[in-house]
């Protein structure tokens, strides 16, 4: 529920305000797409933190480029981690 409330103004910006302003983002995916994905993948608080950090890096002096949302703690994160973790000390 909170995720939807946080994503709604971002979608409003993407569909109604962004076409008037023009493409200003220096990153791929755009900051608004990054924010939506971060909130969906990491939840409200961590997603907002990641989105705020990304927006803070998006300025004219930034080199920009490809900057994906980091993997979450679910199955996607386990897929990128090939080694085993110990759960108990030996």
From Swiss-Prot:
Domain of life of the source: Bacteria
Annotated S-S bridges: none
Record keywords: Cell inner membrane, Cell membrane, Membrane
The keyword Cell membrane appears for this protein: yes
InterPro entries, per database record: Membr_insert_effic_factor_YidD (IPR002696)
Transmembrane as UniProt keyword: no
Similarity-based family: Belongs to the UPF0161 family.
The protein's role, per its UniProt record: Could be involved in insertion of integral membrane proteins into the membrane.
Annotated protein name in UniProt: Putative membrane protein insertion efficiency factor
Organism annotation: Bordetella pertussis (strain Tohama I / ATCC BAA-589 / NCTC 13251)
Taxonomic lineage from the root: Bacteria, Pseudomonadati, Pseudomonadota, Betaproteobacteria, Burkholderiales
